[in-house]
C-alpha cells in the first residue's frame, strides 16, 4: 500500500475496524472498476460496516447469538416511518432445522470436500443496518444442525463461493506451509 494513501488515515482514532474500513474505502476509491472482497472473523463485524460502497463486499463469520431479521416489508401506504427490518428470524440452531440444505463441493484449506450448504437473504441489522446480506450455513455431510454460519454483503456470489472466500482468509495452524 502506498505511503501517501496510508498517511491520510488517522491513527488511534476510534475502533480498529473503523480504521480498517477507511483504508479499504481508500483502496475502493482508487480502483472503482474492481470489486474488493474483504474477509474477517466474527470480531470484524460492527456498526462501522454500515453503508459500505457498492464495490466493497464484506464476508464474516456470524456470531451464534446474532439477531437476524427478515427483509423489510413493503410500504403499507399509511403515514409514518416505514419499517426498516422485518420480523426477527429464529436463533441459528432453530433456523438450521427449517432451512433447505443442498450438497456441494467446496475447496477449503487446500482440499476439496463435500459439505451441505443452506443459504438465504436476510438482515443482520446490528453491523450492517438495512443492507441485505446473504446467510450461508455450512455443515459436514454426517452432521445435523450447522457447523459454521457465514454472512456476506455479496449477493451475487454463490454459497460455495462464499465458503471458499471465507476459508481463504488464513491457513489453519495444522496446515503445512508449502515450501
Where are these regions (language model features)?
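Short, well-ordered alpha-helical microsegments
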Residues: 45-49, 159
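Short, charged/polar micro-motifs that form catalytic or ligand-binding hotspots
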Residues: 10, 39, 43, 165
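Short, glycine/acidic-rich beta->alpha junctions
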Residues: 19, 40-44, 52
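An anionic, glycine-rich sequence signature occurring as long contiguous blocks
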Residues: 1-9, 59-172
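RNase H-like nuclease fold core
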Residues: 1-33, 76
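Short, surface-exposed basic-aromatic patches at helix termini and helix-loop junctions that form
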Residues: 49-61
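Short, conserved catalytic/metal-binding motifs centered on acidic residues
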Residues: 36-44, 58, 150, 170-179
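Short, well-ordered loop/turn elements at secondary-structure boundaries
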Residues: 32-34, 52-55, 143-146
Amino acid at each position: 500500500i502506498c505511503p501517501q494513501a496510508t498517511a491520510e488515515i488517522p491513527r488511534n482514532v476510534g475502533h480498529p475496524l473503523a480504521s480498517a474500513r477507511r483504508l479499504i474505502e481508500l483502496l475502493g476509491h482508487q480502483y472503482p472498476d474492481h470489486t474488493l472482497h474483504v474477509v474477517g472473523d466474527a470480531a470484524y463485524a460492527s456498526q462501522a460496516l454500515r453503508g459500505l460502497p457498492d464495490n466493497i463486499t464484506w464476508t464474516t463469520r456470524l456470531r451464534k447469538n446474532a439477531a437476524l431479521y427478515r427483509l423489510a416489508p413493503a410500504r403499507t401506504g399509511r403515514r409514518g416511518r416505514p419499517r426498516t427490518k422485518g420480523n426477527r428470524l429464529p436463533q441459528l440452531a432453530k433456523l438450521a432445522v427449517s432451512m433447505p440444505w443442498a450438497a456441494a463441493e467446496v475447496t477449503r484449506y487446500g482440499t476439496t470436500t463435500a459439505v451441505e450448504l443452506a443459504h438465504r437473504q436476510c438482515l443482520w441489522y446490528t453491523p450492517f443496518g438495512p443492507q441485505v446480506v446473504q446467510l450461508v450455513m455450512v455443515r459436514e455431510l454426517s452432521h445435523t444442525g450447522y457447523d459454521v454460519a457465514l454472512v456476506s454483503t455479496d449477493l451475487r456470489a454463490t454459497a460455495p463461493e462464499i465458503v471458499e472466500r471465507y476459508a481463504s482468509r488464513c491457513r489453519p495452524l495444522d496446515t503445512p506451509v508449502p515450501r
